[in-house]
Curated annotation (Swiss-Prot):
Entry similarity comment: Belongs to the tRNA pseudouridine synthase TruA family.
UniProt keywords, alphabetically: Isomerase, tRNA processing
Active-site residue list: 59 (nucleophile)
Stored InterPro entries: PsdUridine_synth_cat_dom_sf, PsdUridine_synth_TruA, PsdUridine_synth_TruA_a/b_dom, PsdUridine_synth_TruA_C, TruA/RsuA/RluB/E/F_N
UniProt function note: Formation of pseudouridine at positions 38, 39 and 40 in the anticodon stem and loop of transfer RNAs.
The organism's taxonomic lineage, starting at the top: Bacteria, Bacillati, Actinomycetota, Actinomycetes, Bifidobacteriales
A GO molecular function held by the record: RNA binding
Signal peptide: none
Species of provenance: Bifidobacterium longum (strain NCC 2705)
Protein name: tRNA pseudouridine synthase A
Amino acids binding substrate: 128
Length: 303
């Protein structure tokens, strides 16, 4: 049996999240169907389930520019994808998947995973970014599927004061959907808001010599970046929504601090729309630390 590491990206707008669900288009379901096709394994073959384990289970409408999954597959089945090609089996599988997957999923690479690697439990940290266009932003319509537009002027200083309260080990019960048997305790390493500088006008080099704006799709956007060891369900979107309420003046900084101090879930700190959120990066330790990391992270965290 071989464990493969799969690095991929996807536009989440057309999916009901990562996790496979009956009769719904999901990222996991789409890739697993493609694997069954290219490896010629029946979908009901219990001996070869071809089931993916993922680093971050994204929700409906959430994107990923860097996602990681692992797959356990027998050597006999894996070798089927080589066919007449004289290339490594991982490259052959990458090519065949790219040929059958839809354009909103991209496989960046497949490799044999190091010993002890677990896509979910070996991860050191995950980075999410949420993009917002407020009244001061220049909205590029090409980004409408991955940016949330709000008709408000946002105070980034207040929003950063709120975000700073999340850094460290906390119970994020006010900002997460309860998970029976799980915990909402997480360690946030970085959390901050910034506005992408608006691209200056520069002379056009063409004959008209008219000023034009250099192409920067994120010019003027308000961007939230958060890094943590792991995230509870809906945690990032709920934090973003609450920070926006503070930045727009609809809620006070004291209200946000109270939600952090008293981890009780209620409607005012619920998740904001998904389309602005992207899973940007998954980081892993050195190969010789993968197994130890996976064992440690499986333990239930306490404050």
């Amino acid at each position: 049996m071989t464990r493969l590491r799969i690095d991929l990206a996807y536009d989440g707008g057309g999916f009901y999240g990562w996790a496979k669900q009956p009769n719904l288009r999901t990222v996991q379901g789409t890739i697993e169907d493609a694997l069954h096709k290219v490896l010629r394994v029946p979908t009901d073959d219990a001996a070869e389930p071809l089931r993916l384990t993922v680093a971050g289970r994204t929700d409906t409408g959430v994107h990923a520019s860097h996602q990681v999954a692992h797959l356990d597959v027998s050597d006999e089945v894996l070798n089927r994808c080589v066919g007449h090609m004289t290339i490594p089996v991982t490259e052959a599988l990458t090519r065949r998947l790219k040929a059958v997957l839809p354009s909103d999923i991209v496989i960046h690479g497949i490799a044999v995973a190091p010993v002890g690697f677990d896509a979910r439990f070996s991860a050191l940290e995950r980075t999410y970014v949420y993009r917002v266009a407020d009244r001061s932003s220049e909205v590029d319509p090409r980004l409408r599927g991955c940016v949330l537009t709000v008709d408000e002027a946002l105070d980034l200083e207040l929003m950063n004061r709120a975000a700073s309260l999340t850094i460290g080990l906390h119970d994020f019960g006010s900002f997460a959907t309860p998970n029976p048997g799980g915990t909402t305790i997480r360690e946030v390493k970085t959390a901050y808001w910034r506005r992408v500088p608006i691209t200056p006008l520069v002379p056009d080099e063409m004959a008209s010599h008219e000023a034009y704006r250099t192409p920067s799709l994120e010019s003027g956007l308000v961007v939230f970046t958060i890094v943590a060891d792991a995230f509870a369900r809906n945690m990032v979107r709920s934090l973003v929504g609450s920070c926006i309420k503070v930045g727009s003046g609809r809620k006070s900084l004291e209200w946000f601090a109270g939600k952090m101090a008293e981890p009780v879930r209620e409607g005012s700190s619920g998740p904001i729309a998904p389309q602005g959120l992207t899973l940007e990066h998954i980081a892993y330790p050195a190969d010789d630390q993968l197994a130890a990391r996976a064992e440690a992270i499986r333990a239930v965290r306490t404050l």
